[in-house]
């Protein structure tokens, strides 16, 4: 994995010698940004952007509690098609309000039995405030407040569906999860670098009669964009998740923690009216998590 990432970065440097840009200059190439990592600059006052995503996930296996990879049994299959919409609105030139909804279709084949269910996943509400502008070696710095809203089905599982009817987030369905984070972006012409850290705090929820408290979890993301002529760009991204053991009826559930690390290269094309990106995501390591391969396509349009 590290060899692949190293070769990717080396290739970028060979393509063009970088000229490091002061963040205060007027180099602002249009871009859809990374897939998961936030970009720190917020929307201009009164501007609205809409960003739909189409995501196709194929599960090749899973990482168990010890981080060991186990492939799916022969003949078993799991896949998912997600459609997401992220909308952002600039309240002021430094403050924006965002919302994200998810609709998903789950497909499972287990020992020859096929299951298919669809429905809303969990939704998210965000507000972001830009504290610092990109200047000198200081990155654009933005604070994030977010709330996960449990709009996806999380209980009363149909045992004949092998879990296909459950639509809650992987960090725990059914809970309201407030979160707080920080986001950085830095222009280093012809590169743009982004990073974020977001800590979330799930609230207790009753699931099928059991008092369930999912552990706090941390999302940590980093991405780099490399801008080419004619509106093209290359993107590389790493996404991490760490979550502790959950509690059910007051007792800790051993080995219920979740960890994952996802690698994603992508290519984009953008102009001043529309920004596009196609990427491949692969979960390369984890614990108690699905080992997914994903194709992601997205574009941004601003009104």
Kindly label every feature range from the protein language model:
Residues 21-153, 162-203, 210, 217-223, ...:
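Transmembrane beta-barrel domains of Gram-negative outer membranes and organellar outer membranes
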Residues 16-18, 124, 296:
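A generic alpha-helix preference that emphasizes hydrophobic side chains
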Residues 140, 215, 292-294:
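Short edge beta-strand segments in beta-sheet-rich domains
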Residues 1-28:
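Cleavable N-terminal export/targeting peptides
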Residues 280-286, 292-296:
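A short, acidic, flexible beta-alpha connecting loop/helix-capping segment that sits on the rim
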């Amino acid at each position: 994995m590290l060899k692949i990432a190293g070769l990717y970065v080396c290739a970028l440097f060979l393509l063009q010698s970088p000229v490091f840009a002061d963040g205060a200059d007027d180099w602002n190439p249009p871009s859809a940004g990374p897939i998961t990592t936030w970009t720190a600059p917020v929307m201009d006052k009164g501007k609205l952007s809409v960003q739909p995503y189409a995501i196709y996930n194929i599960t090749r296996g899973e990482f168990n509690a010890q981080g060991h990879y186990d492939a799916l049994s022969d003949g078993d299959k799991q896949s998912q098609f997600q459609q997401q919409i992220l909308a952002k609105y600039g309240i002021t030139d430094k403050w924006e309000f965002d919302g994200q909804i998810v609709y998903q279709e789950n497909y499972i084949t287990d020992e020859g039995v096929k299951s298919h269910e669809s429905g809303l996943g969990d939704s998210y509400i965000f507000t972001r405030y830009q504290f610092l502008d990109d200047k000198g070696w200081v990155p654009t710095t933005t604070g994030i407040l977010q709330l996960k809203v449990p709009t996806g089905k999380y209980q009363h599982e149909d045992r004949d569906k092998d879990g296909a009817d459950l639509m809650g987030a992987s960090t725990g369905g059914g809970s309201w999860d407030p979160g707080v984070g920080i986001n950085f972006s830095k222009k280093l012409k012809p590169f743009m670098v982004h990073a974020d850290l977001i800590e979330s705090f799930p609230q207790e929820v009753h699931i099928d009669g059991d008092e369930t408290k999912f552990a706090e979890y941390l999302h940590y993301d980093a991405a780099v964009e490399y801008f080419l002529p004619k509106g093209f760009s290359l993107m590389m991204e790493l996404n991490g998740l760490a979550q502790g053991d959950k509690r059910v009826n007051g007792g800790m559930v051993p080995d219920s923690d979740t960890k994952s690390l996802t690698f994603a290269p992508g290519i984009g094309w953008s102009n001043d009216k529309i920004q596009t990106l196609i990427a491949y995501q692969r979960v390369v390591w984890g614990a108690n998590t699905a080992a997914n391969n994903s194709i992601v396509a997205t574009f941004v349009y601003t009104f």
